[in-house]
Amino acid sequence: GADVKIEQNYKNGVLQSDNVNIMSRSPIKKLVVMSEQTTFSKVTVTIKAFIDERFAKARCSGAAVHKAVLPVSFRFADSQAYQGSIGIEGISKELDKLVMENLYNTSSFVTRPLVRANLNTSNSPNMSNAFQVSNLSSLADRYGSQYIILGTINSVSTSEVGNNVLTKLMYVPTRTINFDIDVYDAINEQIIFHRNYTAEADWPFKQSEYIDLRSDRFKSSEYGQRVYGLAAEVSKDLVAELQCKPANAKIIDLDGDDVVINVGRENGISPNMKFTLVQAASMSGPNGDNYSAYEKSNSVYKVVSVYPHAAKLHPVDLQNNTLNVNVNDVVTLQ
């Protein structure tokens, strides 16, 4: 929630001016420099801002509910992307491990176990194919998740320095790491996040050598550091994107006037939380495709019972409550 901008101007190696500008909707308690990386042309510094949670949550009601996310194993975009992984064929599993560890350590999410699924999905942020949407929605329902995280490896290829002996002595080959992260919202049935992550670093290993990606030798290399850094960025970006998203839940059962929703204690649901009913309807497009439409109602429900993975809600005003409530309707946290 904080944007920290630091500018330092140098002339002939002498610091001329130093300026720190912090933009945040919530008070910042302190700043801590987490890491620093120096290259020939720039210095990259990672700063952690400690924000007063009382103010942050007051401005972001969605943060009160821990979103259920389902990571799907990384896949290669195509055969060419896979062929470029010679020596590090296990990079997809290593990215799975790194991203999963970061997600598990994020209190904003309820992270489901990694799923290895061969999904026929598009890399485009505009996902309109009904078959793809149906696949992802079914997967989300099966594992009780609203958000599905998809990773696609576009390239991990090495660069060539040519056959010239002098060139080979002077230059070290480089290797790229380029992948996409997409987040699918199963309730709204659309991709809500699409971002590309890319880096290039020296590759000091032999061309045909198999590399143990969990060895200290790989981890300490510049390329290994960039892989680890990008995996950490994914977690930070997902928290920033999803934490304040409206907290939605599906109605999974009806009990008289009460409704049961598919989020519970594990998601941070507590008694007396209030939700607004959003009714779902199935519509048909001009080409015969079916899609869901949602219409917000005036009906308000209050949490009366909380279970590990579900909660029961009761109407606040029975006299003005919507009568035709159905399973698969949606409620949104007020």
Model-derived regions, located:
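Intrinsically disordered, low-complexity charged/polar segments
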Residues: 2-51
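Short secondary-structure boundary motifs at beta->alpha junctions and helix caps
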Residues: 171-172, 178, 185-230, 287-308
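C-terminal soluble interaction/assembly domains
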Residues: 266-334
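Short, well-ordered alpha-helical segments
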Residues: 1-19, 225-237, 241, 270
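N-terminal segment of the mature soluble domain
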Residues: 1-14, 82-152, 190-194, 270-273, ...
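A short, hydrophobic beta-strand-centered structural micro-motif
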Residues: 23-35, 71, 127-166, 171, ...
